[in-house]
């Protein structure tokens, strides 16, 4: 019953998200609006590949942000918004599949509390990030990707906790979990995926490993449309790139879950760690270059008259 209610709420939110996005897209692609130089075909491929790998366990945010930065496909300051807007629908598809197939029944108060916390965090985080200047976003994403690479490395090397048997939390432990999921929802708006830190949190709280999936999937599926709303409203994303991620991503999810199901991904995960670390360094270097250029511009600015 609780699962059905959750899936119904997700369906309503997803439909609302699509409707709002279409309204804004009609304005974006009106005859008078400036034309984007982004090409749709590569974005479809990125959406397919990133969400295919996401369904198999390699995060779509790390892959997408790395590809965008390495190949210069989307402006640095538009990457967080583009990922949150574009990956929202494929993530909803993942959530419908994984929550619908969930074998372990997570206690409803725990599930709802953690999802709600992530959603509020996303709303606050997106409202903040969507107003940040380019340099601050570069620094934030650089740090976020570095942290994400460390989490992936910990997963590969088996450093992460193993979990327990609990199917729910109460009292102080629930409050702690809610607080941290709020923070994870906010941080996702910068590009650090919620899955890995949320999974670690659930394991540290002594919960069943399988309980992580409905909580993670539910949190991301609900928080991404909410965060996406703010990026769409502030026009801090690439519309054409986000469309490509969404359209290409859903078939990637379906193919990975229903056809491929599993792959030997150890070497892929190692490659992703190195690529993400390199991308993190590139973003921080870009931020330093931007800062130096601003300082140089200020030093050469003419002094106000009368001094």
Regions found by a protein language model. Give the residues of each.
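Juxtamembrane transmembrane-helix boundary motif
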Residues: 1-50, 99-190, 203-204, 209, ...
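Transmembrane helix boundary and interhelical junction motifs in multipass membrane proteins
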Residues: 56-65, 190-199
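Alpha-helical transmembrane segments and their lipid-water interface positions
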Residues: 58-61, 90-98, 125, 227-230, ...
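Residue-level hotspots within transmembrane alpha-helices of multi-pass secondary transporters
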Residues: 63, 123-124, 197, 229, ...
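Short amphipathic helix-loop junctions that connect adjacent transmembrane helices
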Residues: 69, 199-206
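Membrane-interface alpha-helices at helix entry/exit sites of multi-pass transporters
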Residues: 72-85, 109, 206-217, 240
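Membrane-embedded alpha-helical segments of transport systems
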Residues: 81-97, 219-225, 251-252
